[in-house]
């Protein structure tokens, strides 16, 4: 196994499909597709591509740190008590442990992510 992994967005394989947990759904009927590309250690560090259709959900990061780059689409993230922040293709951000707020997908979004638990 190589220690160098290239992300080939055209050959990501079959995604894991899911829906938000009912207690996290605020509006709409979003669906998710996740392509996990690589994991390290005991899955403490993971990376992949995630896609979501329009809707609003509660985002609770807990102890997870997540780095994201939006590949396509538009989202608005609002931390509880904070100002809404809009992100679209090319934007990069980090959700730190303890983040609690809303994730609103305005246009089907696809992001590249790295999560550390």
Roles of regions detected by a PLM:
Residues 81-98:
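Short acidic-glycine-tyrosine-enriched beta hairpin
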Residues 1-44:
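A short, N-terminal "cap"/entry segment at the start of jelly-roll beta-barrel domains
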Residues 94, 107-117:
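A short hydrophobic beta-strand segment most commonly corresponding to one strand
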Residues 39, 43-62, 96-97:
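Conserved short histidine dyad/triad with adjacent acidic residue
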Residues 17, 48-49, 57-62, 79, ...:
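Short histidine-centered beta-strand/loop micro-motifs
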Residues 6, 47-49, 67, 92-94:
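Conserved hydrophobic/aromatic beta-strand scaffold that supports enzyme active sites
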Residues 52, 62-77:
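Short, conserved beta-strand element in jelly-roll/cupin
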């Amino acid at each position: 196994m190589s220690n160098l992994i290239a992300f080939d967005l055209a050959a990501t394989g079959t995604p894991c499909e899911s829906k938000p947990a009912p207690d996290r759904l605020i509006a709409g009927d979003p669906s998710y597709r996740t392509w996990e590309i690589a994991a390290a250690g005991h899955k403490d560090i993971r990376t992949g591509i995630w896609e979501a259709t329009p809707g609003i959900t509660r985002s609770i990061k807990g102890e997870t740190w997540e780095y994201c780059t939006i590949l396509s689409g538009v989202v608005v993230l609002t931390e509880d008590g904070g100002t809404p922040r809009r992100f679209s293709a090319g934007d990069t951000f980090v959700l730190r442990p303890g983040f609690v707020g809303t994730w609103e997908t305005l246009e089907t979004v696809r992001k590249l992510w790295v999560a550390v638990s």
